[in-house]
Regions:
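Bacterial Sec-dependent N-terminal signal peptides
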Residues: 1-30, 397
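Extracellular, repeat-based ectodomains that mediate carbohydrate processing or recognition
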Residues: 26-396
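Short strand-coil-strand connectors
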Residues: 77, 424, 461-465
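Residue-level detector of functionally pivotal "anchor" positions at catalytic/ligand-binding pockets or at interdomain
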Residues: 251, 392-418, 470
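Glycine-centered tight-turn motifs at strand-turn-strand junctions
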Residues: 415-416, 437-453
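Short proline/glycine-enriched turn/loop motifs at strand-loop junctions of beta-rich domains
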Residues: 421-428
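Short, glycine-anchored, charge-dense loop/turn motifs used at functional sites
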Residues: 430-438, 456
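C-terminal tail/sorting-segment detector
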Residues: 454-473
Length: 473
């Protein structure tokens, strides 16, 4: 199924609707065989992948117990070198995959943020490499004299290549803390509040800090009376965080912390795409889109609306018009799913594939980066206690030429009771905005959709042609 063309219709006295059909094409991903990033001796906890300035994949992975530590494995000429232990500290918090260390890249600089276990106030650290991850300096404590919690640092770089950190500040209430690096002091400045415009902060959900065109951004799971939606916060200077918008229409209410965050990427047209898990209708993975130029929320949808299995831990990346998403799915065993689209996030569902099918054991916690030529995927292989790396390529496209309006086989109109679709016989699926399937079936000549005061997605399919209508009261 596909939601390639979303058309918003607004009822006043009537409804106005513009429709463009699309012919559906499915991109193909081809994969090399998985390889071990390192041996079991170096662990597979909290896996993250990024590319350094040379374009080489770097995989961050941690180990608890014997040989505990935080390691970076770098691929050069198709081979991963020996893991580099980036800090001497061994008591690193690696027990929550979503809450674990983070990695950021700026030119030849690579930064990793991490938390020392049981040192919730002073244990947040950032360590930096100046040579694409090969050697590492002394770590910086982000709040060495703090007396209140500074938990789960998420490091990012600003446009000048200086690190800054978003984290969870304090307990009951918890705020989003922002800390900037001060070059004069060679240390991080004290935390400032980055959540003044949000309805509370989810106390153990990781931050998602990043920069784009001089702006500072952070995607935060909020907590407003146990409504735990994701919000995008923004600041022009990293100090004044008075802009925030709700980017999550799933409206998940839960009275415990779900300990999950987002993965985000900015497309070539300035659209921010974020991927996240919500469990308002079972644990599923979703996408959300925002126009950063106008700071306007656009849409939310389920990555694979037809799926009925539990999903979690999405990762997303883009280059040019292409968007690549990876996540885990639990259908008896855990497997890693991947989807790609050059027609927006709505078309991801057309290419969903299980890339670990046939491998023994559970394969979980994927991290993906796409460089415009290759998909670089790292994930946790539980059976062997290692990180696997997969390299893939995309061929084909998610969308071919549009259908001219006069060739459109369906028209839609409205009245006080709902919507009326007329045209060629076809199958249809009705979704809510969270991607939940409400109704499926076939119709002959005419279909009536009742107005229940909720926004709906109507998808109509005949052979390879798909039209999708967004129906808004």
């Amino acid at each position: 199924m596909s939601k390639l063309c979303y058309m918003k219709t607004i009822i006043t006295l009537g409804m106005f609707c513009l429709v463009l059909g699309t012919l559906v094409a499915q991109p193909t991903m081809t994969w090399e065989s998985p390889i071990d990033v390192s041996s079991e001796e170096f662990g597979n906890r909290c896996t993250r992948i990024a590319l350094n300035q040379a374009g080489n994949p770097m995989v961050l992975h941690g180990k608890t117990g014997d040989n505990a530590g935080l390691y970076l494995s770098i691929m050069e000429n198709g081979i991963f070198g020996d893991p580099i232990q980036i800090v001497s500290e061994t008591n690193i918090y690696l027990f929550g995959e979503s809450e674990g260390p983070r990695m950021a890249v700026y030119e030849n600089r690579v930064a990793v943020s991490y938390q020392i276990f049981n040192e919730w106030a002073t244990g947040g650290h950032v360590v930096i490499s100046e040579d694409n991850g090969h050697t590492w300096g002394e770590p910086y404590a982000v709040a060495p004299t703090a007396t209140e919690d500074h938990f789960m640092p998420h490091v990012a770089f600003n446009d000048d290549g200086l690190p800054w950190v978003a984290l969870k500040l304090g307990v009951d209430p918890t705020e989003e803390g922002i800390l900037h690096f001060n070059t004069d002091l060679d240390a991080f400045d004290p935390a400032i509040s980055g959540s003044t415009a949000t309805p509370g902060v989810c106390e153990c959900c990781p931050s998602n800090a990043f920069g784009y065109e001089g702006m500072y951004y952070n995607v935060v799971r909020t907590n407003g009376d146990n409504l735990r939606d994701f919000w995008l916060t923004a600041s022009p200077d990293g100090v004044n965080w008075d802009s925030a918008i709700d980017i999550d229409e799933t409206d998940w209410v839960i009275n415990a912390c779900p300990a999950s965050g987002t993965s985000s990427t900015v497309m070539e047209d300035g659209t921010l795409i974020s991927a996240y898990m919500s469990a308002s209708n079972g644990s599923r993975v979703y996408w959300s889109s925002v126009d950063l130029s106008t700071f306007t929320f656009l849409e939310t949808g389920q990555i694979d609306p037809s799926n009925t299995f539990s999903e979690n831990h999405p990762s997303i990346s883009s280059s040019g018009a292409w968007l690549v998403a990876a996540w885990e799915r639990n259908s008896d065993d855990y497997n890693v799913m991947v989807a790609a689209s050059n027609a927006g996030p709505q078309a991801l569902e057309m290419s969903v594939v299980n890339v670990t099918e046939g491998l023994s054991g559970n394969n979980r916690h994927p991290s993906v980066v796409y460089d415009g030529e290759h998909i670089h995927l790292a994930y946790q292989n539980a059976e062997n206690g290692v990180v696997h790396y997969l390299k893939g390529e995309i061929s084909g496209a998610s969308q071919v030429e549009g259908v001219e309006i006069e060739e459109n086989p369906w028209t839609i109109s409205s009245n006080e009771s709902g919507w009326i679709l007329k045209g060629e016989d076809a199958s249809y699926t009705l979704y809510d905005l969270g991607g939940r399937t409400l109704e499926t079936g076939k119709f002959l000549n005419e279909l009536h959709i009742s107005n229940n005061n909720k926004a709906l997605i109507l998808q109509v399919r005949k052979n390879d042609q798909v039209n999708t209508f967004k129906l808004v009261k």
